Structure formats: C-alpha cells, structure tokens
UniProtKB/Swiss-Prot annotation:
Its EC number is 1.14.14.5. GO terms for biological process: alkanesulfonate catabolic process. It comes from Escherichia coli O139:H28 (strain E24377A / ETEC). Keywords: Flavoprotein, FMN, Monooxygenase, Oxidoreductase. Catalyzes the desulfonation of aliphatic sulfonates. Signal peptide: none annotated. This is Alkanesulfonate monooxygenase.
Length: 381
C-alpha cells in the first residue's frame, strides 16, 4: 500500500527548541511559502494547516499558497459552531475550485472552553458534537449539489444551495479526529478519513477497530490516518540526541503551566496524550522509538518517532499494517525537517507521490441572475 505523507505549516510559530524564544524564528508569509514549496517538491501529498487563536487563519494561508505550489494539497479546518455550514460549504467549494481540486478539510470541534467562549461558543462537549454532526450533514449535502432544508437542534437552514460546485466529486474529502465515543460515532457516520494522534500501536489498533466497527454499522468504510512528529537522522544516536536538544530549554515551571492549560480542556484525546507522560521528563520513550517529549508543552499531537531512516520507516509500516494510509508529520524547525524526512525517510517507504493535477474545464457561465441561479442556454425548438 502506497502511503500518503503530509507535512505541516507552523502558523503558530517555529524554532529549534520547545518552550523558549531561544532558536526561534519569525513565521511570515515568505517562510511559510518556503515550507510549502519544499513539501511540494519533495513529494508530500499535502500540508496540514492548524487552527485556533494561536494560529494565523488557516483559510487565508491556504489560499495564499495556491499560486506558489503545483500539486500540494491543503488540509484546512472546518469549525462547526463558529461558522455557518452554508458559508463553510461556499468557502470549501471556492478553495477547491481556485486550487484545481487540491482542497481537503479537517473537522475541528474545539476542546478549550476558554478559547471557545472567546469565539462565542458556550456548548458543552456533547452539545458540540451534536452541533458538529448537524453541521457536517448540511455541509456535505450542499457540496453534493442538493438544495437543503434542515431543522435541527443547533442548525437551521431553509433553501440553502451552492451555485458553484467543487472540482472534486462528490465533494472534497473530509478528515476528522476524536477519541470519545461521540467523536468516533460522528467519524463512523459522516467523515472520509479518521485521524488519530500518535499513541502506541496497540492503542491505535484498538481505536481503529472501534471506528471501523461503528462505520460498518452504518454501512460505510472509512480510511485512517495518524498525526505524528518525526525526528530522523543518519543514525539512531543522532536522532535521540536531537530529541533531547528539542526540550533542553524546558524548565519545570513551563511544563507545569502547559499541563495546567491542557487539563482545562474536555478533549478525551488530549487526556490520552497527557497520560503518556504525566508531565514528567523521565521515561519519555513510551513505545519503541515513540517519544512523548513534545507533549510536555505542546497541545494536540505530542509524540514523535525518533531514529534513523530505516528505523522510523519500520515504525511507520507497523502503523500502516493496522490500516493507516495517511501520515501527517512535522518536525522542528519545519523547513529543515521537511527536507530531512524527504531525504532520509522517504527512500525507505512506499510513498504515494502526487501528480500535478490537470486543469479542470469549468462550464462557461453568465453572471448569476438575481443572486439566485446561473443562466443556462435555452434549447431551440
């Protein structure tokens, strides 16, 4: 099975070390463009663009990278409860059309009550997933070309429709990650690819089996992906030394503050990440070559595969054997590590190198009439 390898655009900051200004660098448009172009040339399938108040806006960043890349896809966040599904569907179709079919979407429900409150969202965990399920139903139906009337608990639309369809049919693929039962049920019923953070293989296997069974109950099959950091070097010793350097400027106070911030979230996935290290710096290799040091201060994906190219490739193939076909990777700093992964890891894997998409012809059209429909040629009798 050929593997889809994704990289990451660090719109929330970048540098050589975690938890310090030492070795940091400005993350401006030029730098993000360098990373995107490197990923494009090296054969990555796409890039994940993060979302949240600590990040630049993912949609604007993605749009700005379209003209400077050729085949790279952009995995961009959809935010239920923050955005109308109708507006989000129009945005998704436009991004897909402007990128010539290079748009992918990642459903992000949110987990930090403080950040959500700042965005005007005051739903609890179960309510957010109810809203996300309704959002996704409407979003998908619009992209499928339906005129949608929907009267749910959280979402209400009447006569919603898209005038301009996406390039990808039936619609651009939808990714999603969540560890709770309600999250897995949402994935099983509505998404195309289920993402997990980088837990040890036995825990990932358990999650995949759960989601696969739930999808089968809905008569569906879905794909699987995993989100990991990577520290790959020419030798295993060099890789482990690089891992230690990455957290060499962390102090106990910084770790404690980060863990306290993570503790206020209601994310089951974040709780599982924190349990891998319990905020302690010892015993961070939680599974062969799987290192939890990143999660001491970084929310979300908190584990890294560490080793030389063949070693990391072996660990990736272990995950692939569980049914995972997509790997969303990152490393610090992201420009240099994009090259290291491409040069030291890719030769040891069966990597699916994306082709440059051919321009898709769009039907000629006149201006929309009354902001309601596209004029069509009337058949002559």
């Amino acid at each position: 099975m050929s593997l889809n390898m994704f990289w990451f655009l660090p719109t929330h900051g970048d540098g050589h070390y975690l938890g310090t200004e030492e070795g940091s660098r400005p993350v401006d448009h030029g730098y993000l463009q360098q990373i995107a172009q490197a990923a494009d040339r090296l054969g990555y399938t796409g890039v994940l663009i993060p979302t949240g108040r600590s990040c630049e806006d993912a949609w604007l960043v993605a749009a700005s990278m379209i003209p400077v890349t050729q085949r790279l896809k952009f995995l961009v966040a959809l935010r239920p409860s923050v955005t109308s599904p109708t507006v989000a569907a129009r945005q998704a179709a436009t991004l897909d059309r402007l990128s010539n079919g290079r748009a992918l979407f990642n459903l992000v429900t949110g987990s930090d009550p403080q950040e959500l409150a700042g965005d005007g969202v005051f739903l609890d965990h179960s309510e957010r997933y109810e809203a996300s399920a309704e959002f996704t139903q409407v979003w998908r139906r619009l992209l499928l070309g339906e005129t949608v009337n929907f009267n749910g608990k959280h979402i209400h639309v009447r006569g919603a429709k898209l005038l301009f369809p996406p390039i990808q049919q039936p619609y651009p693929p939808l990714y999603f990650g969540g560890s709770s039962d309600v999250a897995q049920e949402l994935a099983a019923e509505q998404v195309d690819l289920y993402l997990t953070w980088g837990e040890p293989p036995e825990l990932v296997k358990e999650k995949i089996e759960q989601v696969r069974a739930k999808a089968a109950a809905h008569g569906r099959k879905i794909r699987f992906g995993i989100r990991l950091h990577v520290i790959v070097r020419e030798t295993n010793d060099e890789a482990w030394q690089a891992a230690e350097r990455l957290i060499s400027h962390l102090d106990d106070e910084t770790i404690a503050k980060a863990q306290a911030a993570f503790a206020r979230t209601d994310s089951v996935g974040q709780q599982r990440m924190a349990a891998l290290h319990n905020g302690k710096r010892d015993n961070l290799e939680i599974s062969p070559n799987l290192w939890a040091g990143v999660g001491l201060v970084r929310g979300g994906a908190g584990t890294a595969l560490v080793g030389d190219g063949p070693t990391v490739a072996a660990r990736i193939n272990e995950y692939a054997a569980l049914g995972i076909d997509s790997f969303v990777l990152s490393g610090y700093p992201h420009l240099e590590e994009a090259y290291r992964v491409g040069e030291l890891l890719f030769p040891h894997l069966d990597v699916a190198i994306p082709e440059i998409p051919q321009p898709q012809p769009l039907n000629p059209q006149g201006e929309a009439v009354a902001n309601d429909f596209i004029p069509r040629k009337v058949a002559q009798s």
